[in-house]
């Protein structure tokens, strides 16, 4: 986060410097108020670029065995450009290298990692029933059965786990 702040500040100085160089090249024909406008536009462009690059940068840095199962794109009124190209701001990764089979065929315990922009990574264990296309949080250890959700074989998490075995 700190490095992104530094990058935005550097972009602002570069934008202002570019406008100052244009003013010098045109003999002062451009108005002086364009200098802070150039700085602001450069800072905005750096911020937007960083926001859009987060998903690809983070997903490419995942360790071997972690596969992206699903991503969520969003729009916001305070980011009007997201209505043109939605911004991916969170995703779920499955640790396919560490799937644990159950005694019952087709049942697997998987570790899921939830990544979000400006949020800490959360991990959850989930049971996946590949033949039935359903998933459940594991039982709490109190002897109760897990609550299964029928999500179908096309569910991104079920598909990623079942293809990973």
Where are these regions (language model features)?
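Alpha-helical transmembrane signal-anchor/signal-peptide segments
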Residues: 52-73
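Extracytosolic and intramembrane catalytic regions of membrane-associated proteins
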Residues: 83-165
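Hydrophobic membrane-insertion alpha-helices, especially the h-region
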Residues: 14, 34-49
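Membrane-water interface at transmembrane helix exits
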Residues: 19, 23, 27, 46, ...
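Membrane-embedded alpha-helical segments of integral membrane proteins
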Residues: 1-26
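Beta-strand-rich, non-transmembrane domain signature
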Residues: 70-82, 89
């Amino acid at each position: 986060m700190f490095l992104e702040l530094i990058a935005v500040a550097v972009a602002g100085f570069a934008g202002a410097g570019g406008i100052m160089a244009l003013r010098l090249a045109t003999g002062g024909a451009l108005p002086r108020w364009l200098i802070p406008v150039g700085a602001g536009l450069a800072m905005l462009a750096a911020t937007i670029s960083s926001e859009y690059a987060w998903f690809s940068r983070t997903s490419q840095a995942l360790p071997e065995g972690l596969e992206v199962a699903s991503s969520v794109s969003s729009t916001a009124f305070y980011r009007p450009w997201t209505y043109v190209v939605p911004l991916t701001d969170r995703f779920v990764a499955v640790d396919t290298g560490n799937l644990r089979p159950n005694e019952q065929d087709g049942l697997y315990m998987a570790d899921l990692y939830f990544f979000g922009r400006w949020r800490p990574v959360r991990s959850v264990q989930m049971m996946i029933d590949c033949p039935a296309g359903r998933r459940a949080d594991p039982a709490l250890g109190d002897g109760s059965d897990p609550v299964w959700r029928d999500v179908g074989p096309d569910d991104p998490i079920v598909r990623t786990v079942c293809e990973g075995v």
